[in-house]
Amino acid sequence: MAGSTEERPFSDIITSIRYWVIHSITIPSLFVSGWLFVSTGLAYDVFGTPRPNEYFTEDRQDIPLITDRFNALEQLNQYTK
């Protein structure tokens, strides 16, 4: 008995009304929630990345680049001062 897994064919799924009723709501809501996540700045807070205006400070105008992997913690402390 080869070839049949008793699953619905993909063409049946994407041509059904039920599929489009569900996905016409979920797909746009994913885009809207992603846009809100980024535009409100929550993405910066969640992932801990600096905001565009926080890369350079008045005291430090060089690029905050970690160059020594064995003294990385010291370099991080220096950049966060």
Swiss-Prot record:
Entry GO MF terms: electron transfer activity; heme binding; iron ion binding
Cofactor(s) needed by this chain: heme b
PROSITE patterns assigned to the protein according to its UniProt record, in alphabetical order: CYTOCHROME_B559
Main location: plastid
Keywords, comma-separated and alphabetical: Chloroplast, Electron transport, Heme, Iron, Membrane, Metal-binding, Photosynthesis, Photosystem II, Plastid, Thylakoid, Transmembrane, Transmembrane helix, Transport
Membrane topology type: Single-pass membrane protein
Signal sequence, start to end: none
Transmembrane segments: 21-35
Residues at which heme binds: 23
Stored Pfam families: Cytochrom_B559 (PF00283), Cytochrom_B559a (PF00284)
GO CC, one annotated term: photosystem II reaction center
Listed GO biological process terms: photosynthetic electron transport chain
Cellular location(s): Plastid, Chloroplast thylakoid membrane
Cofactor binding note from Swiss-Prot or TrEMBL: With its partner (PsbF) binds heme. PSII binds additional chlorophylls, carotenoids and specific lipids.
Family the entry assigns: Belongs to the PsbE/PsbF family.
Assembly notes: Heterodimer of an alpha subunit and a beta subunit. PSII is composed of 1 copy each of membrane proteins PsbA, PsbB, PsbC, PsbD, PsbE, PsbF, PsbH, PsbI, PsbJ, PsbK, PsbL, PsbM, PsbT, PsbX, PsbY, PsbZ, Psb30/Ycf12, at least 3 peripheral proteins of the oxygen-evolving complex and a large number of cofactors. It forms dimeric complexes.
Role: This b-type cytochrome is tightly associated with the reaction center of photosystem II (PSII). PSII is a light-driven water:plastoquinone oxidoreductase that uses light energy to abstract electrons from H(2)O, generating O(2) and a proton gradient subsequently used for ATP formation. It consists of a core antenna complex that captures photons, and an electron transfer chain that converts photonic excitation into a charge separation.
Name this protein carries in UniProt: Cytochrome b559 subunit alpha
Species: Mesostigma viride (Green alga)
